[in-house]
């Protein structure tokens, strides 16, 4: 065995083959059954000509097939590429081209989009359709059906030489431009994000066999709410499968908080992971009704959040109803994994400080002064620096040497990953996350880059200039607001802007509100004054 995702998963299968691995609606698979279907997928990929290091796109909402394809790809030492199902055609085309995707697995509902872009993607040779029960639109020429593809394949494991040096790539929406692929060594991603470091001792498991032995403990039941196209959900699946847990997948495409609480009660979920307030607030609002209906939620003891703001007021309310919970707020990014966590309990509530989460410094995180390349010490409570992770960190951004040199640096002989989050020390030695140094907007866990939205809005004939900012929002954490200078005084409506911009950007990037200004403030060089735009939008919308 190696510190490799496929090896660790197969080691768990061999130890607990009859244990339930995954639940999706009425479909339930044991570890043995999930392994068999993943083997069939791997054997099918091999027959398609997919080789070690080939890139395989997965373009789907959460489903069991997503996980089977991901695991099958790892078994072949190929690399799955996550594709955002919200993207419009131009965004899809960019990502698939940038990622050098050779084969794509897509749900039927996305057939029309695939059909419209495939001729512009010469490297993309194989199209495999996952039947999702929808009409699907246009049929992609020469497409293969997933179930038909694997039907007659062997359930036997491939004899492939795997290594901890095999690659894992996660595409992030990006905070500084177009999507970027974060390239990890497989061993590093398992240590950082897959549970390869003992949570009690803080030490790395000495062997892959010891890592897989974790599954011999009592089984935990985890519920996956975030989409697998996001790193947080993929890493939750890693932790679940490599620990022998049961992973329950929300089988609804939309988010229904009442239904989620029913799943928690039915499956006796113990570990629930969300993406900030966008999920936390509706779950909080639905909680009293769930308890009033008599749902037994006593199994739940860990409620964690990643990727977005998880407001203390929501945590406090949840704890009023479920006082035995551990609420965990994780700080991190695609380039680092977790750089810190804070734990919120009924008897030990944490207060806000400095505008962001406060957490105990882990031994793998530092705050760096990038001007001097010095490590800021905990007794320096004045200096603001960049939150950085050391040790098991990514190798690079895929095909972006310039950005890689800025993000993955060496200080005192040790490599650090610095995605751009600002932080400082508090008097008690804890760290406070102050936010991303860039102007990116985080809305419901989705990172949105203002320049991309501005360019799309300017396609409208009556938009002379504009700046896009994020303002506080109870549901989404931040919402997108456009400050617009019109070409003339004719009416300009939000729906008209959305229609014009829909050819260029996905719906979740669209402004939720617009405000007008006679002039857009910029520096003499033409650089935007986002501080002015933020203040102006807040004043117009009466946001303090």
Question: What is the meaning of each model-derived region?
Answer:
Residues 245, 301-431, 437-440, 453-454:
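Conserved AMP-binding/adenylate-forming
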Residues 18, 151-171, 177-178, 183, ...:
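Conserved pre-ATP/AMP-binding loop-to-beta segment of ANL
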Residues 47, 75-149:
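Structural core segment of the AMP-binding/adenylate-forming
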Residues 18-63, 70, 88-93, 147:
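Conserved AMP-binding/adenylate-forming core of the ANL superfamily
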Residues 190-225, 229-273:
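Conserved AMP-binding/adenylation subdomain of ANL enzymes
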Residues 30-32, 167-195, 199-203:
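Conserved AMP-binding A3 loop
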Residues 87, 93-94, 104-106, 262, ...:
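AMP-binding/adenylate-forming catalytic core of the ANL superfamily
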Residues 130-131, 503-528:
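AMP-binding/adenylate-forming catalytic domain of the ANL superfamily
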């Amino acid at each position: 065995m190696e510190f490799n995702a496929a090896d660790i998963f197969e080691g768990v299968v061999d130890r607990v083959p009859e244990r339930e691995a995954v639940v999706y609606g009425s479909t339930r698979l044991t570890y043995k059954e999930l392994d068999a279907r993943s083997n069939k997928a791997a054997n099918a990929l091999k027959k398609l000509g997919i080789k070690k290091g080939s890139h395989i796109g997965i373009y789907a909402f959460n489903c069991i097939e997503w996980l089977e394809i991901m695991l099958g790809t790892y078994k072949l030492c190929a690399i799955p590429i996550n594709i955002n199902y919200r993207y419009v055609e131009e965004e899809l085309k960019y990502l698939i081209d940038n990622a050098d995707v050779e084969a794509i697995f897509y749900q039927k509902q996305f057939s029309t989009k695939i059909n419209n872009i495939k001729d512009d993607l010469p490297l993309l040779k194989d199209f495999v359709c996952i039947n999702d029960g929808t009409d699907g639109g246009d049929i992609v020429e020469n497409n293969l059906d997933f179930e038909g593809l694997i039907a007659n394949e062997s359930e036997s494991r491939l004899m492939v030489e795997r290594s901890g040096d095999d690659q894992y790539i996660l595409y992030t929406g990006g905070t500084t431009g177009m999507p970027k692929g974060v390239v990890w060594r497989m061993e590093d991603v398992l240590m950082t994000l897959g549970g390869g470091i003992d949570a009690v001792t803080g030490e790395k498991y000495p062997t892959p066999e010891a890592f897989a032995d974790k599954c011999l403990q009592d089984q935990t039941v985890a519920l996956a709410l975030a989409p697998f196209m996001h790193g947080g959900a993929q890493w939750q699946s890693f932790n679940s499968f490599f620990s022998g847990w049961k992973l329950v997948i929300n089988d609804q495409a939309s988010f229904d908080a009442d239904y989620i609480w029913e799943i928690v009660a039915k499956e006796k979920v113990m570990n629930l992971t969300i993406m900030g307030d966008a999920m936390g607030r509706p779950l909080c609002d639905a909680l009293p009704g769930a308890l009033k209906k008599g749902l037994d939620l006593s199994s739940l003891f860990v409620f964690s959040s990643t990727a977005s703001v998880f407001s203390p007021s929501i945590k406090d309310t949840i704890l009023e109803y479920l006082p035995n919970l551990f609420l965990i707020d994780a700080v991190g990014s695609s380039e680092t994994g977790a750089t810190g966590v804070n734990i919120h309990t009924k008897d030990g509530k944490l207060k806000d400080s400095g505008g962001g989460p406060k957490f105990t410094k882990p031994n793998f995180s530092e705050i760096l002064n990038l001007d001097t390349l010095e490590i800021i010490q905990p007794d320096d409570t004045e200096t603001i620096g960049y939150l950085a992770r050391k040790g098991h960190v990514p190798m690079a951004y895929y095909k972006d040497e310039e950005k890689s040199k800025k993000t993955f640096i060496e200080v005192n002989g040790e490599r650090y990953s610095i995605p751009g989050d600002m932080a400082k020390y508090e008097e008690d030695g804890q760290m406070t996350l102050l936010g991303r140094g860039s102007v990116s907007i985080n809305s419901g866990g989705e990172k949105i880059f203002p320049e991309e939205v501005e360019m799309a809005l300017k396609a409208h004939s009556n938009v002379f200039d504009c700046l896009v900012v994020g303002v506080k929002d109870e549901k989404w954490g931040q919402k997108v607001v456009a400050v617009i200078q019109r070409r003339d005084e004719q009416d300009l409506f939000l729906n008209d802007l959305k229609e014009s911009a829909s050819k260029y950007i996905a719906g979740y990037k669209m402004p939720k509100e617009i405000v007008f200004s006679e002039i857009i403030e910029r520096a003499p060089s033409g650089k935007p004054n986002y501080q002015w735009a933020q203040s102006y939008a807040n004043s117009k919308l009466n946001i303090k």
